[in-house]
Amino acid sequence: MSEQVNNKVLITGANGFIGGALMRYYQNQGKDVIGVDLVGNGKDIIEGDISQPDTISSLLQGSDVVIHTAALVSNAMQDSDMWRVNVLATRNLIEAAKKHKVRRFVQISSIVAYGNSAEGELNESQPVLADGGSYVLTKLASEHVVLQAQANDAIEVVIVRPGDAYGPGSRPWVIVPLELIPKYQFMLPAKGEGFFRPIFIDDLIRGIYLAASHPDAAGEIFNLSCEDCRLRLP
């Protein structure tokens, strides 16, 4: 079945690594796309806080698809802030999207939904596990918020669980390692015994694009990552 034509696409967290790459991809495809982030650029990225109802309402007018990448990712943040941004703002956004007759809502979650201790190959049928910090807990809670919102068939939802996205400009998996490795300060996942589930940013963006556009993707959860691997010191 062919892809549906997305009219106006709204991307939250448009200045982020994933959000920015999505903006460029849609623009290169000639699509009508607009972004929102705490810092705008005066052009295609609007300055706004998605936790504020006025911001949400104005952005959603005429939008056909919302791709929600905005989130706090550091466990160093206060739990209350993580909950406000990752869960409450998601709830407000998708409820507003329903009111504005948005057709599809794509929630960018994370492979950590299966828990930090998950080993081996993962598939979407496996149970989730809240064994991490606030990031894991709020990502799982935001998934529940999104899944509940589709209960009345008022909006199509898709959840994407990316692995560790890397590529040019990636701070956690490119910039920071290149800074720390010469200093012998780079720590491997679980001291070299943990699983690393990488995905190149271009592959991830194509996957998200299909999640947002393919008719059969509605109501589904997708893991997007490459083959599992362990990173060990030689």
Q: Regions from the language model: what does each represent?
A:
Residues 210, 214-234:
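Mid/C-terminal beta-alpha module of Rossmann-like enzyme folds, strongest
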Residues 150-196, 201-202, 210:
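NAD(P)-dependent short-chain dehydrogenase/reductase
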Residues 81-87, 132-143, 164-167, 194-198, ...:
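Short-chain dehydrogenase/reductase
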Residues 42, 50-88, 96, 114-116:
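NAD(P)H-binding glycine-rich loop region in Rossmannoid oxidoreductase-like domains
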Residues 9-29:
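N-terminal Rossmann NAD(P)H-binding glycine-rich loop of SDR-like oxidoreductase domains
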Residues 92-134:
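Conserved Rossmann-fold NAD(P)-dependent oxidoreductase catalytic core, especially the SDR/UDP-sugar
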Residues 119-165, 186-189:
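Catalytic helix-loop patch of NAD(P)-dependent Rossmann-fold dehydrogenases
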